[in-house]
Amino acid sequence: MTKKLPVEKKLSRKPISRACEFCHLKHLQCDTGRPCQNCVKRNIGKGCKDKERKTKKRQLKNNTSNSDLENIPKQVKTDIIPGPIRMTPTTAIYQQNNDFSIKKIHSLTTILNSTNSFLGTDFVNTGNIDDPKNEINNPPSTLSISTNGSNPDSTFDSIWAGDEYKKLNDIIGLGRASGLSLSHPNTETEKGIVHVNSISKINSRPFISLSIDSTGGSIDEYNLRYSIPSDSTKFKQLKIDTNESFLSPYMFRKAIKTPKEFHEKRSTILPHNYRIGYRYLLKTLHNMFINETTLDAETLSIRKQQVSYIVKSILVKYTENFISISSNMVEEDLLLQELTLQRTLLEFESMSRLVPATPIAIWRRTGEICYISSEFTSLTGFTKKEVLNKRSYIFEYMDHESVIHYFETIYNKLSFNISSNAAKFSSSNNFLFTKCNLLLNNGSFLKCVCCWTVTRDTLKIPVLFTGHFMPIFDVQ
């Protein structure tokens, strides 16, 4: 055991930079002499030498990097060959993109302002609405946008700019507008002209988009093709494709009635094609407001303005929030959303059957009715098979003023809780109270007070809307 040293001796000792091997091993206080006093006392003075230290890795790296830096200028000097500087194709493209790419990228706001003409009066001037079956039968094509340039293979340098065109393509559905040209001021005098070919296919996100069209033609052809007939043109009957693979809610409920059957047959459930739903939405609006031969010129003009206002409320105010939330969704997310919807719908139906309630109707965010209660059928006179055995929309059972009010509240306020100073009803995050005129089986309308509730998924996307209707009877 090592003898304890007095305090005076401990204070007089001074540490040294390097100990001998013996003192280092035994953790003893060594001195600067060689041999040290500890080794002399133990008669091992012949082997007393400094402890060799390992080279630090940090020092080794610094020495290596310094030596490399010293050698670099020499190598550069020997490798440089005097002569003219030649730019590689990669360098030229890089410099060209740096000079002109920022100037040529159009923002989403600019594109919407330049392509929203079909939302105004052009949407309701001449032509006819096509059958939604073209959404399925016509193969998709790419969107080609050019500005009178020469290189068709170059694309946007910014992935965000390309994504803006992709989202815009999904919104307005210009699937085959290969002749579309988005010009920019003084584009002929600028050298860095940007071309976009095959930015996005119309079916890039077919189950998410709010697309209206997938047919060809330019913007003008699009306006003519999807506009409402003028006074001089004859109204044509709009046919519905009976061969479309659409499973009505009535038939779906016959196949799956309980939660157990739902889990057994969940592999057969497919994502709902909301794109076709929005196509039929516009078709239904056209039939309700315009497709009447008894309308005079003044009434027809007012109806056209009303339809244009409704379409704007969907595309301008609703899609901005919807696309920002659902831009990263894939088809698997839509499948999960559909499974959640159907399972939630089973719970709602079970609750309405067990508990006596007010007349209830449940519909998707497109307005497609999924369920009506027995009280609703008793109130309106329509049977469940009449309503649920086809693609029915909730606004089909309202008058024109209620339809306009419906789109103002559902698409502009309730879906994403957008504030509105003009709203004359109390509301919260998930429900609101309002009034509407409900269509009865005999063709008349019944004034009702309504409570509309929204059910959202985990991404805060509206999935189901529930409407409670309480009739208001005038007391004389």
From Swiss-Prot:
Where is it localised?
Nucleus
Q: Which GO terms describe its cellular component?
A: nucleus
Annotated segments matching region Disordered? 48-73
For this protein, the record's SUPFAM superfamilies field holds: PYP-like sensor domain (PAS domain), Zn2/Cys6 DNA-binding domain
Q: Name one GO biological process term.
A: cellular response to starvation
Identify the residues that the record assigns to the PAS domain, covering every copy. Answer: 347-417
Give start and end residues of each DNA-binding region: 20-48
* Gene3D superfamilies in UniProt: Zn(2)-C6 fungal-type DNA-binding domain (4.10.240.10)
Q: What superkingdom does the record give?
A: Eukaryota
Keywords attached to this entry: DNA-binding, Metal-binding, Nucleus, Transcription, Transcription regulation, Zinc
Question: Any idea which GO molecular function terms this record carries?
Answer: DNA-binding transcription factor activity, RNA polymerase II-specific; RNA polymerase II transcription regulatory region sequence-specific DNA binding; zinc ion binding
Q: Which InterPro entries match?
A: ERT1_acuK_gluconeogen_tf (IPR050335), PAS (IPR000014), PAS-like_dom_sf (IPR035965), PAS_13 (IPR056751), Zn2-C6_fun-type_DNA-bd_sf (IPR036864), Zn2Cys6_DnaBD (IPR001138)
User: What PANTHER family would the database entry show?
Assistant: GLUCOSE STARVATION MODULATOR PROTEIN 1, ZN(II)2CYS6 TRANSCRIPTION FACTOR (EUROFUNG)-RELATED
Question: Of which family is this protein a member?
Answer: Belongs to the ERT1/acuK family.
What this protein is reported to do is described as: Transcription factor which regulates nonfermentable carbon utilization.
Annotated protein name in UniProt: Glucose starvation modulator protein 1
